[in-house]
Amino acid sequence: NITLQTAAIDQETHIRTPGFAVTETDSLALIHKINRHTQPGDIIILSGSLPRGASTHFYADIITHCRHKSARVFLDTSGPNMATSVQALPFLIKPNVAEMEALIGHRLTTNKAILNAAQCFIRQGVEVVIVSLGKNGIIAVTQTEALLAYCDKLPSQKLITTVGCGDALVGGLALAYQQNKSFAEALKLGIACATANLFSQEPGMVAPPLVDEIKSTVKLDSLKNL
């Protein structure tokens, strides 16, 4: 994927190519490698669309193998791939509102509706549902918690790009979980990483001092009384 930035007119041009193709042998080799190296408690991130040639159940197969190893899968994909993969019960899913609407089959126009939709997947066995609200933050749901997390004050810098913010969010969450941080601390780090990415020339290359600065401004509002 290529992103061209035209600063003079504040415009981005996105070039998306199909990418490489894989064979069934390639897919099986990757699953075998995951089986061989994955340990209990590990975090595996499955992100983006499937490569050409991969089975529509490829992510679901990986999730199943990881569950057998007591590893945690963070799933960040969309469309039919998300619908198929979520049935294998990853540890965490991160749809945006439109992707959640596609999963549920109807519009979600309020935070309460989004919360109810997220809780459907919690009841099915997904442990964490993170619904991205774009600039308005995220709705984060587990069996015991329901929170709206957002950045209360942006740094006084020029925004560069939104490309990679979702990846930075997932990366921050994964790091926090790997460090056994609390759910609240994981959300704060995830939001801080995603927000810091707005000011980065390279997607995902966030500056730790800026992440720390933003983290102190992240707010968590309970949604339990919605």
In which residue ranges do the predicted regions lie?
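Short, acidic/turn-prone active-site loops that include or flank metal/cofactor-
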Residues: 18-20, 79, 97-100, 152-156
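Conserved phosphate/ATP/ADP-binding segment of small-molecule kinases
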Residues: 57-145
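Conserved phosphate-binding/catalytic region of the ribokinase-like
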Residues: 83, 111-226
